[in-house]
Amino acid sequence: MTVGVCYFPEHWSRERWETDISQMAEAGIEYVRMGEFAWRRIEPERGTFDFAWLDEAVELIGKFGMKAVLCTPTATPPKWLVDEHPDVRQREQDGTPREWGSRRFTCFNSPTYRSETERIVSVLTDRYADNPHVAGWQTDNEFGCHETVTCYCEDCGEAFSEWLADRYESVADLNDAWGTTFWSQQYDDFESIDPPKPTPAANHPSRVLAYERFSNDSVAEYNRLHAALIREANDEWFVTHNFMGGFSLDAFRLAADLDFLSWDSYPTGFVQDRQPDTPTVDELRAGNPDQVSMNHDLQRGAKGKPFWVMEQQPGDINWPPQSPQPADGAMRLWAHHAVAHGADAVVYFRWRRCRQGQEQYHAGLRRQDGSPDRGYREASTAADELFDLDSVDASVALVHDYESLWATRSQPLSPDWDYWNHLRTYYDALRARGVQVDIVSPEATLERYDAVVAPTLYLVGDELSTALTDYVDSGGCLLLGARTGEKDPYNRLHESLAPGPLTALTGAQVARHETLPDHVETRLSYDGATYEFRTWASWLAPEVGVPRGEYRTGEAAGNTAIVRNAAGDGSVTYCGCWPGDDLADALVTELLDAAGVEYTERFPDGVRVMERDGYTWALNFTSDPVTLTVPDSTGFLLGESTVDAFDTAVLDGSIRGVGLASE
């Protein structure tokens, strides 16, 4: 386990560098990330390179016993390149070019930009191929940030046509698969299929989904170019990429070309702009632990190995609606939280607050005058406390499908439908019970998991249906959620009623569905108790499945909401609605009991426990102290039974028997 920092020597005078880097070493920092936005400094004009400054910075890092993580600088090409080749810019859906002047405005499919990428990455990696102080590379920076996965330029139009031609035997097959007879949308050839541009009504959902798939494949192909060039120069370097939380960019697609995944964690920002509820005061100070850890578990699950937090919030940040100061202790708390969920490194962004540009109001571990800020002290403390660990061993998987995210986003049927928040309902319920969760793709091998939760497998074909059926037949316990199996992989309704090919497994079909706004009363009964649900309700018609839940309000009253079916040596529960928190807890605890998975009492919001490598972390994201109950045989490596506000304790033992003392 290690701590790192992001550094921008190009922002500071050379006279300061040695002081900065020596102070990093004093703080216990082991890795320094550099160079992601430095293309113009490296190549001030075409073919003229200035490596002296970067050479010196890398040597200083090595001098003080640390390692450099370098980045390919392709997120910010220099002005001279864009002036030479304005065609490298992305275009909005209406054709407006995304202009030079910030970052992430270039097209992944531009042949010119791919050529320029190959040129600068080759020069950089060749330069440092034999440098012992360079440990590895980050490809580019935050693919997809600022809604830039999709581009609608001519290069993308041509590439989209070619992409479709590679995937369909003929345009007639495409017309049949998409159902283009609707509104007379048949195509005569692949070349006539444009990216979906603005239209008076919605674009065809199959076309929209295909363009999402194509766009994500384009990012993956562009990332593959970087990774191949890096490994060609030195196959001992690691290659990673820093994803962002809650993005629709398919991390699973990129994972194959990376040694491990990384992501950028900004808890007080995400809680403001990536969840619908108004943040509590505690969340404004420390974020929501489940929102953050779901991203930890996604980065870990996508590759099946430990991940890095490549940018950890160091203090106040500039980009969310509000810029609250994190609570005292939050920066240390976040480091422990990441490690407990499988991180092998936490890299703080940035070393010093920048004096210029768009991120002047983004804190660093040190202030712009070089004096230490709170983040510096907390990062130093975390560096002293954290230790090496084996990987997280999760017995529960949560299946996350980016393609279902894209498809339901284009046809939500309610302004309140949100794929991520529906996923969070089940994820949060598992985390409140202390359960470690691998977030995996629909293509993942499920047999190693005792229990699997699949909240929204909206697009289901025969292959996925077979995999889920085989999992249950072999003794697995499966929980399916609302909107499961509504569509086929081409985004068409199945010829049979939902859940389509999963009907035999679930033992039920969807007779009707409805969406309801928040002010409508929505209640159901489940196992003799009454619960709330929200937004979505599928009225289930059991065939061989056993009814377990029944709607009690509105037009749905008397219809089945939840069924359970035994299949082979396992079982499946199918919940047709979006459950409230209490119902989600009841569903997951029944699942865990059936699967024999150990879990804790239900912890309150903001207080979480999790186990890694035989140690248990208790993390308090609230402003009130909490007192733990632990077995007599369990000791504390860090902290004690009373965990103060925004503090952590580390127990030398499993989660078994860990709870909260009653008030």
UniProtKB/Swiss-Prot annotation:
Keyword match ATP-binding: no
Activation/inhibition comment: Requires 4 M NaCl for maximal activity. Loss of activity if DTT or beta-mercaptoethanol is omitted from buffers. Addition of 5-20 mM EDTA, 1 mM Cu(2+) or 1 mM Zn(2+) results in loss of activity.
EC number(s) from the headed UniProt entry: 3.2.1.23
One GO cellular component term: beta-galactosidase complex
GO molecular function, one term: beta-galactosidase activity
Gene Ontology process terms (BP): galactose metabolic process
N-terminal signal peptide: none
A Pfam family it matches: Glyco_hydro_42M
Temperature dependence: Stable in 3 M NaCl for several days at room temperature, but approximately 18% and 50% of specific activity is lost when samples are stored overnight at 4 and -20 degrees Celsius, respectively. Activity is irreversibly lost within minutes in low salt buffers. Activity low, but detectable in 30% sorbitol in the complete absence of salt and it is stable in 30% sorbitol for at least four months at -20 degrees Celsius, but at room temperature approximately 20% of specific activity is lost after 48 hours.
Catalytic reactions on record: Hydrolysis of terminal non-reducing beta-D-galactose residues in beta-D-galactosides
Residues where Zn(2+) binds: C107, C151, C153, C156
Entry keyword Hydrolase: yes
Enzyme class: hydrolase
Active site per UniProt: E142 (proton donor), E311 (nucleophile)
Keywords: Glycosidase, Hydrolase, Metal-binding, Zinc
Induction record: Highest expression in cells grown on galactose. Glucose or glycerol, alone or in combination with galactose, gives an intermediate level of expression and peptone-containing media gives very low levels of expression.
Binding site for substrate: R103, N141, W319, E359, Q360, Y361, H362
Subunit and interaction comment: Homodimer.
Family: Belongs to the glycosyl hydrolase 42 family.
PANTHER family, A to Z: BETA-GALACTOSIDASE GANA, BETA-GALACTOSIDASE YESZ
Role according to the record: When overexpressed, cleaves several different substrates including o-nitrophenyl-beta-D-galactopyranoside (ONPG), chromogen 5-bromo-4-chloro-3-indolyl-beta-D-galactopyranoside (X-Gal) and lactulose, but not lactose. Also has beta-D-fucosidase activity. No beta-L-fucosidase, beta-glucosidase, beta-arabinosidase or beta-xylosidase activity.
Official protein name in the record: Beta-galactosidase BgaH
